Structure formats: structure tokens, C-alpha cells
């Protein structure tokens, strides 16, 4: 992180990242961040070059870089956009491309801020499959409670910058009173239709 916390600690594999001698560079190669707005993340002219950036920065050989990039593009189902210029892409295409940039890094941890924003139903479903297949830690900030219900086993509900509760996703996301007290609604899949 850029700003040290005023309290608490962050540990990776049991070691505080604030301990003397800890190499943040090593941690940065293990953690991927998907921004809420892909325009803040994508900066190259085309998708292929952008997705190559992270693996190249790891110092990987070009053959491995291309292998990772092609795998990430295929995993996200955007290999057909490989050479497309970013400024010509839709919001959903940019979001999927920004996720591919992180997957190409093969991180141990993915941090995502509102990952389903701007996605059409097919790409949203694809994202859910990707998240369910991701075998490592994923930390997701989202108001898409249906997606959270499908992809996360644990939920930390926050309101006004404070933790309201921390627990089993199904228990929290099925508690209508708790959700409404904190400005949320039941996931759509659990709401009764009003006709």
C-alpha cells in the first residue's frame, strides 16, 4: 500500500508487511488489483500490450509473457480483442481487459473494486465462473450482492467506513433486516417478485 494504517497490521504468509526488511516488491508480484474504473488501469494503446505489461515487469522471458497473456485473454473470453485499441472498446470490454491484466500476473491474491460494473449478463456470468475457479484469496468490494452470494463464502459488511458484521456469506446476505439497516437489499435472486 501507499499509506500505512494508523492501527492494525497486514500479514502475508504470517509475516507483517510492515516489518523491517520486508520486500514489498515481492508482495506486489503476488497481489493483483482490479480498479473500479478500468480507465485508471489500462494505459497502453491495445489490449495485448497492456496485458503484457505486468508479466514483462516481472522479468519473465518473452515466450512466458506471451503464454500468460494468451491464457488470460482466453480465460476471460476476449482473445478476439487482442489487437483492439483500448479507446475503441466498450466499458464492459475494458473491464474484462483490466481483469485479464491481473490474471496474466498469476497472483496469489486478487483485490477487486466493483468488478461487475459495466458488464453485460454474459460477461458477468463469465466473471463469476472465473472467480469461482480462482483457487487463491479474493477480496471483493461490491454492491452486486448476487455475485457475492455466488462467489464468496465470507462477507464483511461495512457501512460508513466501519465493519458492521463479518461472517458466513449466506447468513449475512439472507438477513433482510441487517441489509436494509445498512442501505442494502436482499440479493435479487432472493427477492420475491412484486407484480
Model-derived features with residue positions:
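Conserved beta-strand-loop-alpha-helix hinge in the C-terminal portion
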Residues: 162-185
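H-loop/switch region of ABC-family ATPase nucleotide-binding domains
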Residues: 142-143
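Conserved ABC transporter NBD signature motif
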Residues: 8-19, 27
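Conserved ABC ATPase signature
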Residues: 85-89, 93
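A short, surface-exposed alpha-helical micro-motif characterized by mixed small hydrophobic
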Residues: 148-150
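Conserved ABC ATPase "signature" region
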Residues: 63-81
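Catalytic Walker B motif of ABC-type/P-loop ATPase nucleotide-binding domains
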Residues: 110-113
Amino acid at each position: 500500500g501507499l499509506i500505512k494504517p494508523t492501527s492494525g497490521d497486514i500479514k502475508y504468509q504470517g509475516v507483517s508487511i510492515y516489518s523491517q526488511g520486508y520486500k514489498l516488491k515481492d508482495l506486489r508480484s503476488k497481489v493483483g488489483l482490479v480498479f473500479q474504473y478500468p480507465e485508471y488501469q489500462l494505459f497502453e494503446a491495445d489490449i495485448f500490450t497492456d496485458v503484457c505489461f505486468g508479466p514483462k515487469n516481472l522479468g519473465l522471458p518473452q515466450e512466458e509473457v506471451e503464454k500468460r497473456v494468451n491464457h488470460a485473454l482466453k480465460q476471460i473470453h476476449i482473445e478476439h480483442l487482442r489487437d483492439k485499441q483500448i479507446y475503441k472498446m466498450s466499458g464492459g470490454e475494458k473491464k474484462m481487459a483490466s481483469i485479464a491484466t491481473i490474471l496474466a500476473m498469476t497472483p496469489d491474491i486478487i483485490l477487486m473494486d466493483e468488478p461487475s460494473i459495466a458488464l453485460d449478463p454474459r460477461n458477468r456470468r463469465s466473471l463469476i465462473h472465473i472467480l469461482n475457479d480462482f483457487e487463491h484469496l479474493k477480496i471483493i468490494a461490491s454492491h452486486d450482492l448476487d455475485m457475492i452470494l455466488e462467489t464468496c463464502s465470507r462477507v464483511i459488511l461495512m457501512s460508513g467506513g466501519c465493519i458492521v458484521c463479518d461472517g458466513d456469506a449466506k447468513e449475512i446476505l439472507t438477513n433482510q433486516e441487517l441489509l436494509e439497516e445498512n442501505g442494502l437489499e436482499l440479493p435479487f435472486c432472493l427477492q420475491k417478485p412484486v407484480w
